[in-house]
Amino acid sequence: MLLEGIKSYFTSDHVDGFLAYQVSAGMVLIAGDPVCAVSEAPKLIRDFVGAMERPVGAYQVSPVMLEAFRREGFADIQVGKEAIFDLRRFTLAGGQMELVRAATNKARREGVVVTEHHPFANDAQKLNTELLAVSQEWLKDKGHHELGFLLGSLGLERSSAKRYYVARSENNLGRIEGFVVCEPIYGRNGYYLDITRRRTDAVRGTMELLTAEICNCLRNEGYDMVSMGLAPLAMLDDPDLMDHRLVTWLMRFVYQRFNTSYDFKCLYRYRAKYHPHAWEPRYFCFNQRRLSVGMLYALVQVRNAITLQGLLARTGIKEMAKTWKHAASFIVGLCSAWLSSW
């Protein structure tokens, strides 16, 4: 994912590694952790900040690299938690997995079969075209567009380390019901379930079956872990949030109320029903005295997360007033936090 999109890359003569970053709204935003040894990260961050003439932030920093940013004078705030699965312990057995197990059994009874797809195989073009169609249908139904920064793309047009798992009906002879694109996590011997798509009328249990089959397949191949990705703004429980009370209030307000264009609650609930073995915190680090509205705006822009089309999608005339009311409340809250930070 770090090699996709319109990112730039910083290297230092003093460190074997690099930072992926993007400039947005006058800010420099680092994508995830520095790619280097933990012991070398402070030096790489220091060189990077010295080379930039703008405020610097880093989105989705892990606890492993958090101290490196703190050593270089960065403040930080928790922005959500990432769902992590230990593949050696992954199972559908037990009471807590009853709903997921029932969904997978339903899909199997309906003839849904999961296989790995290779986009550059000789006979792959037909399925590639169908994958694109399913993706566009899903995005249109959700009122979304492809997000960026730390989310990958479908990438069917170029060879890569991505792996594609496809669920097809009629015992693998029918249409594509849904699919998942996985990205390798080299440092942890695992994979990230990056892009998940399904038809609007997909067989019930399709995505649950995909997730379970992917985990079983990767475990059998000797991989250690799977990440379902970040649940943004969910489970904000870091004690240091008290140092950023206004922004914390704003994030919790957005999580509870602002779910028209980007359903934070739904993202969390979907991950939570699989009962991850760990919820790892992720942070936004910044080298300013306070987390400014400008930095928040830059982060939203670089992720391409909110658009007017998204705000109004899937809402009729009766719902439009409610949407604008929520949007206005969000803007008022944002401005209040900004004014109070001065």
Segments from the language model and where they lie:
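A conserved beta-strand-loop-helix scaffold within acyl/acetyltransferase catalytic domains
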Residues: 1-34, 59-77, 82, 88-103, ...
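Short, glycine-rich nucleotide/cofactor-binding loops
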Residues: 35-40
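Flexible acidic/glycine-rich loop/turn elements at helix↔coil and beta-strand↔loop transitions
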Residues: 328-333
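Polar low-complexity intrinsically disordered regions
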Residues: 335, 339-342
